[in-house]
């Protein structure tokens, strides 16, 4: 405002005639009056004094525009006049001189408007990648016995919470600076601007609220889109990449605001929500500065909510458990019947039957690359696409009923897939106990396995052997009647192997069933009741034998009797 007034005064002084007031024409007298008000405003020592002179200046300028004696930007003048009058009527006299004078309430719109439109939504994109990565198939969170649609809701909520926390962390430094130096601001602080030839008046509180709603709507849409598409496609990055394209789309000329306004199809896309300033309006460091229409808040939210509903509908369909007949025999046990096992378009195993009865331990023996892990993943029910045909059930519960099946069957994966690097061993065990509603005595279990001394360490700091014992403790702590253990003895010294074998033997004695994949044939022969070999893409059951006999059978089967 002051810059415009100073410019007028300078121009007036340059062209002002050296004559008395009686020699001035009406237009010159009007200019002199304007210059007087402008000088008074510029010389004002308080905002209240400035406001009195500024209102008179803009009112007189408005008369000049109406009479035609003044030409120029009438809309800016009228907006400034409306702003001054609103301040006067509300009794507010605070006028920010620059962005550094903005209170907290005005800082957020200013910060969002001066940044690229996609920037506020990057936290939600990052959080979607992190959360979906932490809950991808095969992770501990994905194994929990939770209905698929409820898990989807939990993932969406986690993305929203994490994204909001990241966004607040990014805005915190500037927001705290504005709050400490300039205060919170006044909710009723007036804002006036022109758009499409119409004067619009609102308040800082309204703009702040509308912007928060726009950011939340955009973040929610990103969260739902990312979670649903990644769940439906079983690809962690499918959802976040699609969301990233939507967020970036408003930056493309084809999808600009003008294009959206003239294209019915583009207008149906939820793109305005990713340009929140366009929908909510914006005041810069001075309240008559304006970017965006400020008239699309309601429609923007309606479209965003409609898309959220559509995505949730897709998610409900994608997570629905299809009807599938169970196996012919419905007695207690883990049963695989007439199954083809594979991944992608490749079938690697054809299995007539596999039955693991309660209170038994079975071993799975085969060379690396023969399909052991793929078979174990299929048996776990966590990877439904591994079973290309046939049926899998535990105690008559079909694996398609994922939550009920997960209460019965637990897969302890090889490597560190079950462990989160930043969480401690005790946090993993607490999660397992809570998720599976287990009554396991964690303290006693940890003592028996010898892992109590390092329970509080993040798992990334544990050795391979320590991780193996933590994973075994997690499997036991689920209280699932059927445990599938992929290479549970790898990386253990002889003493720890004995401890782990004793723990597994104890669980079998309690009536639990254990299927163990291992290359340590001596331990396997001592621990299990029967064995399965993978031969030429089929599963072959072997009778109980000594370790020496088992080794010879292994050599005969896979090494040609050498």
Question: What do the PLM-derived regions correspond to, one by one?
Answer:
Residues 92-102, 183-205, 246-326, 557-560:
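Terminal transmembrane helical anchor/hairpin motif
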Residues 93-128, 157-227, 231:
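Secretory targeting signals
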Residues 365-367:
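The feature captures the beta-strand-to-loop junction immediately N-terminal to the Walker
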Residues 380:
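Helix-to-loop junction immediately C-terminal to a conserved catalytic motif
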Residues 385-405, 541:
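Conserved ABC transporter NBD signature motif
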Residues 411, 421-435:
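Q-loop/switch helix immediately C-terminal to the Walker
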Residues 430, 439-455:
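Conserved ABC ATPase "signature" region
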């Amino acid at each position: 405002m002051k810059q415009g007034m100073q410019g007028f005064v300078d121009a007036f002084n340059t062209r002002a005639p050296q004559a008395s007031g009686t020699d001035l024409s009406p237009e010159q007298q009007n200019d002199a009056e304007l210059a007087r008000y402008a000088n008074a405003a510029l010389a004002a020592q308080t905002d209240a004094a400035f406001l009195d002179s500024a209102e008179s200046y803009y009112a007189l300028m408005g008369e000049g525009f109406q009479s035609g004696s003044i030409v120029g930007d009438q809309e800016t003048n009228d907006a400034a006049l409306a702003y001054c009058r609103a301040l006067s009527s509300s009794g507010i006299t605070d006028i920010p001189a620059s962005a550094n004078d903005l209170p907290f309430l005005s800082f957020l719109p200013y910060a969002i408007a001066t940044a690229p439109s996609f920037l506020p939504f990057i936290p939600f994109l990052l959080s979607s990648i992190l959360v979906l990565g932490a809950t991808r198939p095969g992770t501990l969170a994905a194994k929990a016995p939770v209905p698929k649609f409820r898990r989807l809701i939990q993932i969406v909520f986690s993305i929203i919470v994490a994204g909001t926390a990241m966004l607040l962390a990014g805005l915190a430094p500037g927001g705290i600076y504005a709050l400490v130096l300039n205060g919170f601001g006044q909710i009723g602080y007036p804002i006036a601007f022109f758009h499409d030839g119409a004067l619009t008046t609102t308040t800082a509180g309204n703009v702040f609220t509308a912007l928060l709603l726009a950011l939340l709507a955009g973040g929610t849409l990103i969260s739902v889109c990312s979670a649903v598409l990644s769940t439906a496609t079983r690809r962690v990055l499918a959802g976040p990449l699609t969301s990233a394209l939507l967020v970036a789309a408003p930056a493309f000329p084809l999808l600009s605001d003008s294009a959206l306004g003239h294209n019915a199809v583009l207008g149906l896309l939820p793109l305005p929500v990713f340009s929140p300033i366009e929908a909510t309006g914006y005041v810069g460091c001075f309240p008559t500065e304006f970017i965006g229409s400020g008239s699309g808040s309601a429609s923007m939210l309606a479209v965003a909510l409609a898309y959220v509903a559509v995505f949730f509908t897709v998610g409900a369909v994608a997570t629905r458990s299809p009807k599938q007949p169970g196996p012919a025999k419905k007695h207690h046990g883990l049963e695989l019947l007439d199954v083809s096992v594979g991944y992608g378009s490749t079938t690697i195993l054809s299995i007539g039957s596999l039955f693991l009865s309660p209170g038994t331990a079975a071993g799975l023996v085969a060379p690396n690359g023969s399909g052991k892990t793929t078979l174990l993943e299929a048996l776990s029910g966590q990877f439904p696409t591994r079973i290309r045909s046939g049926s899998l059930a535990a105690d008559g519960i079909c694996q398609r009923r994922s939550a009920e099946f997960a209460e019965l069957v637990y897969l302890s994966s090889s490597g560190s897939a079950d462990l989160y690097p930043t969480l401690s061993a005790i946090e993993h065990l607490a999660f397992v106990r809570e998720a599976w509603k287990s009554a396991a005595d964690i303290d006693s279990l940890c003592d028996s396995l010898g892992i109590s001394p390092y329970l509080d360490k993040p798992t990334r700091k544990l050795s391979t052997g320590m991780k193996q014992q933590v994973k075994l403790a997690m499997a036991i702590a689920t209280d699932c009647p059927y445990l599938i253990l992929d290479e549970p003895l790898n990386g253990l010294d002889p003493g720890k192997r004995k401890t782990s074998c004793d723990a597994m033997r104890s669980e079998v004695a309690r009536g639990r069933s254990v299927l163990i994949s291992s290359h340590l044939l001596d331990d396997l022969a001592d621990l299990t009741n029967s064995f399965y070999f993978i031969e030429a893409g089929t599963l072959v059951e072997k009778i109980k034998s000594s370790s020496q006999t088992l080794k010879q059978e292994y050599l005969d089967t896979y090494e040609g009797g050498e």
